[in-house]
Regions:
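Histidine-acidic metal/acid-base catalytic patches
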Residues: 2-14, 26-38, 50, 55, ...
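N-terminal small/glycine-rich loop or linker at the start of catalytic domains
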Residues: 5-15, 66-79, 144-151
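Active-site mouth loops of central-metabolism enzymes
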Residues: 13-27, 79-92, 157-165
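Extended recognition/assembly regions associated with phosphoester-bond processing machinery
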Residues: 19-27, 43, 50, 55, ...
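Glycine/small-residue-rich interface belts in oligomeric ring/scaffold proteins
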Residues: 45-71, 79-80
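Short glycine-enriched loops at secondary-structure junctions
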Residues: 67-72, 115-117, 253
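Short, glycine/acidic-enriched loop or turn micro-motifs at the edges of active sites
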Residues: 71, 191-192, 222, 296
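Active-site acidic/histidine proton-transfer and metal-coordination neighborhood
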Residues: 87-215
């Protein structure tokens, strides 16, 4: 296995932290810091408004290890796959703002959803995004109606390929821009929904090989869903992606998915049926940052991950 020698952005060893996506108030942040103590570390969330970011700054500055684009929050997610120049231009502008945010907070990594199988701007609000993802051009590729889940053949479809190729080309250029500023751009594997790009271990390996400056964010919950939808061994899929040596950060959360059921719950790592011990053993050995992205029991989940990172029993 290749080793990732500067997982926390060139600023020291890999760390355990938590995404601020699960914290909606200053009180929640303060409570988490009180529970975890001086080792509390954070990933800025794409849901943080400029106002909330400014309010939270005194609490979290010096504790931020990564940011999730776009931050502060924007009306649309970046869509580097679009053939519409105006959509791409706005995406790059928003990514430049996110880079400024990361630098301002001392974050060494920015996590990105690379793009979508459409030329349209993709709303960051799920309520606004869902009608776009339900458009007729996506219906032929839906294998499981509940969740609009695709199959493994989707990545080879004529509708998918040109969007993936455009996204790859722009990711390389953007990663090099970020690297010049001392920040690593990490592309996240998404859940296997029609309209989303980059779900499978094979695609993540392709991204990892594109350029030395392009990194990965391994979302273990998303890959869990994909393993059921695509029919591959989940733990082997994790090992495949980790084995690239390019995983800068891991998003850690569980869900209630199973064969025929696909749920991106972002629930506690102790979700019944989720292979927690095996997952944490694999990711803890990677030296990637370990970021809890659950939306419940954040301190409890952080302590579980801290134990795993230290090689201690977690249950």
């Amino acid at each position: 296995m290749a080793r990732n020698g500067w997982a926390s952005g060139g600023r020291g060893e890999a760390v355990t932290g938590v995404s601020l996506v699960g914290m909606k108030s200053l009180e929640a942040i303060e409570g988490y810091i009180d529970e975890i103590g001086p080792n509390a570390r954070f990933e800025l969330s794409y849901q943080m408004s400029a106002e909330f970011l400014a309010q939270a700054a005194p609490l979290i500055r010096g504790r931020v290890v990564s940011a999730h684009a776009c931050c502060p929050s924007t009306e649309f997610f970046p869509n580097l796959a679009s053939a519409d120049p105006s959509v791409v231009a706005q995406s790059l502008t928003d990514m430049e703002t996110t880079l400024e945010t990361a630098l301002g907070f001392g974050a060494g990594i920015v996590v990105l959803h690379a793009g979508y199988v459409t030329d349209l701007a993709m709303p960051s609000s799920y309520a606004a995004r869902k009608p776009i993802l339900s458009r007729p051009e996506f219906l032929n590729d839906v294998r499981h109606a509940d969740g609009a889940i695709c199959g493994p053949e989707y990545r080879a479809s004529p509708g998918y390929i040109p969007y993936a190729e455009r996204a790859k080309e722009r990711l390389v250029a953007l990663a090099r821009r970020y690297a010049r500023a001392g920040v690593r751009l990490a592309v996240e594997n998404l859940n296997p929904r029609v309209g989303y790009l980059f779900h499978s271990p094979e695609e993540m390996l392709e991204l990892a090989a594109l350029d030395p400056d392009l990194w990965l964010c391994l979302d273990v919950g998303h890959l869990y869903i994909t393993s059921f939808a695509f029919g591959f061994d989940y733990l082997e899929g994790l090992k495949t992606i980790i084995g690239s040596g390019k995983v800068a950060s891991c998003h850690l959360h569980a869900n209630s998915s199973e064969p025929g059921r696909y749920r991106d719950d972002h629930s506690s790592l102790k979700e019944q049926g989720f292979p927690l011990e095996e997952v944490l053993k694999i990711v803890a050995a990677s030296r990637a940052n370990l970021i809890v992205e659950a939306v419940e029991d954040l301190a409890g989940n952080t302590r579980i991950v801290q134990k795993a990172a230290a090689g201690r029993e977690i249950l």
